[in-house]
Amino acid sequence: MDLNDTASVKAAVEALSDTTLAGVVNNAGIMCRHYTLSSDGYETTLNVNYYNTMRFNNALLQQVTQGGALVFTTSITRIFVPRHINADSVNRHTFGQLKTYALSKKLITGYALELARKAESRGIRVNCCDPGIVNSGMITMHRWYDSLADIFFRPFIRAAYKGAVPAIRALLSPLSGRIFTLRNIHKH
């Protein structure tokens, strides 16, 4: 499924239409360096990390069994987004790589909190996981200082398997409406 293509998201939902789901972990995400628009006219980072992730889960919610769980990947960067910034404020002139990524994570976290309230009556748990800074291609900023960051910073970041731990904890926990990190559980 291509989360930057709404038709692809709809096709994935259709392919899963006869499937009962015990859990869904939403772990796809991007951080675009430049401002680009999807074929639907949405900024690409917001489209993948928020809009189509939300559309996918809204469409699949009826297929999640009682006692099932939905998990959304968030980021600590979300706390640095000012309250007055929203998806409508992102355009060619206001776009920033990290700023837009952080906004997408703030939005998906807010969506997850609201969904946790709505899904509670059906016995469906909804949580977020924050993997921390994981050694992956996502942290490459495609800037002149990447080689320096690789030398001084990469040795201190988490291996990918440790980044998966919060998602597993969030999926298996009896709690709902929480953010799971490697060591802690936070209320939204």
Predicted segments — roles?
Residues 50-51:
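Ankyrin-repeat alpha-helix packing hotspot
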Residues 2-20:
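Conserved Rossmann-fold cofactor-binding substructure of NAD(P)-dependent oxidoreductases
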Residues 57-58, 113:
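A short, exposed helix-loop element centered on a Lys and neighboring polar residues
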Residues 30-37, 43, 69-121, 130-143:
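Catalytic loop of short-chain dehydrogenase/reductase
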Residues 21-25:
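Conserved hydrophobic beta-strands of the Rossmann-like cofactor-binding core
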Residues 63:
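Conserved helix-to-beta-strand junction in the class I
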Residues 128, 150-188:
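C-terminal helical subdomain
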Residues 11, 40-47:
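Active-site Tyr-X3-Lys motif and surrounding loop/helix of classical short-chain dehydrogenase/reductase
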